[in-house]
Amino acid sequence: MRIVTVMNQKGGVGKSTLVMNLAAVMALHARVLVVDLDPGQRTLTDWAETAADRGIDLPFDFTDENNPAVLSQLRAANNWDVIFVDTPGNLEKSASERIGLVLDQTDFVLLPMEPQPASVKPLRRSISTLVEPRGLPFRVVISRVRRDEATASRRDEMYSSLAKAAIPFLATPVREYIAHSDAQGTGDVVTTYPQTRQTSLAIDDFKSLALELNSIWANERH
């Protein structure tokens, strides 16, 4: 069983989209739980409630919690293969303390970031103040990548910068699609999107991310 925390100091980096859709794809082959530990925003809770209201059966279990200590109880229950945890999108003192308690129960960290220079400083701060002191394995995910030449260039520059700084990252980016923007309002995840060429590409992104992560985790066990 593995607890995966998704975090970044900077809000608006696609954290919620990453959690819900990666969980949906992982749930195709594993028992998955999503935990909303961001009581200030409740983005994932609102998303899950919308899904329930519209009769959409999310492919994973879901719970919203206020106390990070619940993670140890969820681990002990051993009812899931992977638990994804959403956290506050800032590092103000109260949020930082909460994230610290979450990370104390965490096995792996994902840090989504946009392909723009303003994303680098908060990413480094998140890693240096919270992740590295605990010796946690982690990967950066480039998210919210628009499908135009300029953004592709910035994405490649960001990968180069991460490599030079020896910051580990996943090779698969999360590209922007209208379906992702609409999903919170409709309660959908990639596995329940209406089937179009674009939504097929969207689910491919998350399947590729899942393959990368499963490969990393398999190697960790050896």
List each language-model region with its residue ranges:
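Conserved C-terminal guanine-recognition region of P-loop GTPase G domains, centered on the G4
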Residues: 121-135
